[in-house]
C-alpha cells in the first residue's frame, strides 16, 4: 500500500488528516532519515495494519536497512519504557523513582544510527504513548544534539497525524 492509497482509505471527515499527511511528507525541517524514521517509528507504535503497511513501503524506499531497524527498535523499546516510566512518574509513591528499572535497554546505547535520530524517533513514540517523563528526557537530549524546537515539533506533528490516521482506520474497519 502506498501513501496515496492510505490517504484514499480515509473518509471525507478526516480530510484534514489527508492534507496533514501530504504536507508532512514534504516537510523540510527534517532530513529524510529523521522524517521517514519518525513516520515508521510512529506507525510501528500505533500498529494499525494499513497505516503501517503504507508508511513502511514508503520508508523502505528512503531509509537504509540500519535506519529501518532502528526506527522499529525505537518503537519497541519505547513501548516498554513509556509504560514503566509513566508509572514511575504518575505514581504517588515516589519510592519507585529511586529503584533501578531492571529492564534491558541496550539499544539505547548503540541504536545503529545517529543518536539524535534515534532520540527523535523515541520522542515521537513517547508522545503517542503519553509518557511525559520520557518526552522531557528525549527533548532535552535532542536539544543537546542541536535540534531546534521546530524540528522537534515537526516530529511530533508526524506522530500526531500518524496516530490519528490509525485511529480513524481502526474505527472504520
Swiss-Prot record:
Catalytic class of the enzyme: oxidoreductase
Disulfide links within the chain: 131-134
Residues at the catalytic site: 131, 134
InterPro entries linked to this entry: AhpD, AhpD-like, AhpD_core, CMD-like
Keyword tags: Antioxidant, Disulfide bond, Oxidoreductase, Peroxidase, Redox-active center
Catalytic activity: N(6)-[(R)-dihydrolipoyl]-L-lysyl-[lipoyl-carrier protein] + a hydroperoxide = N(6)-[(R)-lipoyl]-L-lysyl-[lipoyl-carrier protein] + an alcohol + H2O
Protein EC: 1.11.1.28
GO biological process: one example: cell redox homeostasis
GO molecular function, one term: alkyl hydroperoxide reductase activity
Family recorded in the similarity comment: Belongs to the AhpD family.
Annotated NCBIfam families: ahpD, ahpD_dom
Functional note: Antioxidant protein with alkyl hydroperoxidase activity. Required for the reduction of the AhpC active site cysteine residues and for the regeneration of the AhpC enzyme activity.
Protein's name according to its UniProt entry: Alkyl hydroperoxide reductase AhpD
